[in-house]
Amino acid sequence: MRLIIEHKSKIEVFVGLFQLLKNWSSHITMNFEKDRLYIQLMDKSHICLADIEIKDKWFSFFECSCNNEISIDATHFAILLNYGLKHDKIELKYEDKGDIDKLYINYLNNNEIVNEKKKEGKGSFDHFYEINLIDIDKETLGIPKVDYDVDFTICSKKIMEVFTELNTFGENLNIKCSENIIELNSHGDTTKLKINIPVDDLNEYAIAEDEEINISFSLTHLCKMCLSMKMSSAINISLSSQYPMLLKYNLGDESSVSFYIAPKVFDD
């Protein structure tokens, strides 16, 4: 397996994704298939599920002759990837030779840019890292396709600001959706905050006929998922009283990062 990322914006997305996932689990299992990189990860509380698909066309180069499933320490991998932000190219390599259990992470630079920087005394050097793989048992969950009652698209930066503000008033978010408005509520022992979002202010909005949603989620987990707002300028949110909430970032090139969060269940 060998892949390359050359675009600076995509390097930031790729690095940012694993910076986020290191807070979910102590390890990450990556499935390299012939036409994609696939990751499924449950957070430590088992409340959130990440489902990530990055197609081969998203990368500058992607080559995988057979399916490879490898697991790595999430924190160490995120630390190594973070160094890639200083470089022009990230290369990941893995060879299934049985006795070699390593992933190779190479940070390379555009020669023309490097030569120009060297003239200014600012040359950057290529870096070559190795990280040991770990042996764990991993089961992939089947995620059924469902029809949600409410779907809307909103600016990812804006919804992060809203969730963060609500989180200062309480740990839980109550969402009410109707044909004309989305109402977000959070409260503590002595204070309460309500934020109304008119549907006209959304990029897209769809709700099933005569449907009204009233459901609650953990704001702590929602804020954690929305830390990945750099992945895309917009986020799609899907709701139903019968299914987990879906938050989906479109990365382009038929690639996406999806987060599922189970609703809060309160005792009567």
Write out the residue ranges for each language-model feature.
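DNA polymerase sliding clamps and clamp-related checkpoint/processivity subunits
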Residues: 1-22, 27-168, 174-268
